[in-house]
């Protein structure tokens, strides 16, 4: 679940997420939600229990678990966001192209998935093979 949320928010950093966003699995079932309050984005599971947060920095976000312990960071430069673990080691990158499609890569540069937003504002997440994983609206 933590890894899943990390991937989601790496994308949302690019997308300038609206005040509230709901996540769904590939079957359309709600899996969680994200709510922005100033420079903080709070994460909730499907039952409304807070699971963590993201706090804006000068060039990205820091992530925290529900107890407030730092779990990682995301630093954005141009169209690329790099994810680091709590120790500062690179975990992966997220790159957005001119069409607005964000592709995720692991620390070795291998593609792990992508995110595409349609005209209605719904973002769909795909795995590395192009299969739908979930969506966000």
Language-model-detected regions and their locations in the chain:
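Sec-dependent N-terminal signal peptides
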Residues: 6-10
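Hydrophobic alpha-helical membrane context
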Residues: 14-15, 61
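Repetitive, compositionally biased segments used for assembly/scaffolding
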Residues: 20-137
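Sec/Tat signal peptide C-region and signal peptidase I cleavage site
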Residues: 5, 15-20
């Amino acid at each position: 679940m933590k890894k899943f949320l990390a991937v989601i928010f790496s994308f949302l950093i690019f997308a300038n997420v609206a005040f509230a966003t709901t996540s769904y699995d590939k079957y359309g079932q709600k899996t969680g939600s994200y709510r922005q309050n100033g420079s903080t984005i709070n994460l909730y599971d499907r039952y409304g229990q807070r699971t963590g947060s993201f706090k804006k920095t000068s060039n990205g976000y820091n992530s925290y678990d529900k107890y407030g312990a730092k779990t990682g960071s995301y630093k954005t430069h141009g169209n690329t966001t790099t994810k680091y673990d709590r120790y500062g080691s690179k975990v992966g990158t997220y790159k957005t192209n001119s069409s607005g499609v964000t592709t995720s890569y692991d620390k070795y540069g291998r593609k792990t998935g992508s995110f595409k937003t349609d005209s209605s504002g719904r973002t769909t997440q795909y795995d590395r093979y192009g299969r739908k994983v979930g969506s966000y609206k």
